[in-house]
Amino acid sequence: IGQNRSDNPVRVSAAEEPVKIMALGDSITDGYFGTDGYRKYFYHNMTEMGHDIDMVGAKDYSGWNPSYTDSNGVTFEYDGDHSGYSGYAIQYMTGTETRQGLLETVQSTDMIKKCDPDIVLLQIGTNDILSNYNEGIIDRLENLVNVILEDMNDSDDVVFVSTIPYMDVLMVYDWFWSYGEVKSDNSQEDFAKIVHGYVDSYNDQIKQMVTEMQTQGKPVKFADINSVIDPSTDLQDGIHPNETGYQKMGTYWSNLVDDYLSTEPETTTEETTSADKYKKGDVNTDGEINVSDLIVLQKYLLKKGGILPEQ
């Protein structure tokens, strides 16, 4: 896991085995307010692009593929396996509000080692901000990502770490009771700006964290779900996406992963020295040492032929 890898080695759907992908996160990954959320669109899009993928997760549909009919009347099957947990924070938190932790669940289920994903799509942190657990939020996320990386079985696995969407604070104003005086001492509009500021700060820190981890040679990639969700039109209840929002997420994720899988890995061209080119005894320099070399040598000794000068 700690190796330097600037290329994209997991590649590809042309491989003999499908690419195993785990959607990991909170209720937005689980698909709250929408049948399996963005995951059904992601799977459908990826297969339409020609990729052979296997969705994996601690929540296993045991080989049964559900079906869904989209707004255009198109019915498709998808792989529903995932690791999305409604109400979860990055790690277990208790104080003003108790939240179960994704970190502890990853560890207790041993899901990464057991499911062996090639790619993890991680989006988590909305409930931390909702419950006013903003202090230390990026440290908790980095710890979670490192635990995932440590549990990954192959050196060419990768974790995509995503930003989180904005919340429509005014729609779910009462849900932010954990903010206490910060909430009561400000107008609703000003409080909404404060919460949006926490989201902005967290998302900026995610991008910076991914960049720093990449410089350390860790296989992480940045994803920006925040960029595709409009809180004024794409949310069902102020927190969770509606079907339009989930579809946008599925499109974003599938385009991002398709680009990753379809990009040719970087190759290193090594300089070849004369010592690499010619083997001792390979008189005719054909890369092999056999009777042909003996014939050339005999001709040389009989002055009926020659050999290449020394290199």
Task: List where the protein language model places each region.
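Residues in Ca2+-coordinating acidic/glycine-rich loops
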Residues: 25, 243, 284-288
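Substrate-gating cap/lid alpha-helix
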Residues: 168-223, 243-248
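Alpha-helical segments with a strong preference for the paired helices of cellulosomal dockerin domains
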Residues: 274-311
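Low-complexity, acidic Ser/Thr/Pro-rich repeat tracts that form intrinsically disordered stalk/linker regions
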Residues: 4-19, 267-274
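Loop/turn elements at helix/coil->beta-strand transitions in domains of secreted/extracellular proteins
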Residues: 16-20, 49-54, 115-121, 153-160, ...
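Histidine-centered active-site loop/cap adjacent to the catalytic His
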Residues: 21-24, 234-266
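Active-site-proximal beta-strand/loop segments in catalytic clefts of secreted hydrolases
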Residues: 24-28, 56-61, 122-127, 162-167, ...
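Conserved SGNH/GDSL esterase-like catalytic core that processes O-acyl groups on lipids
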Residues: 28-139
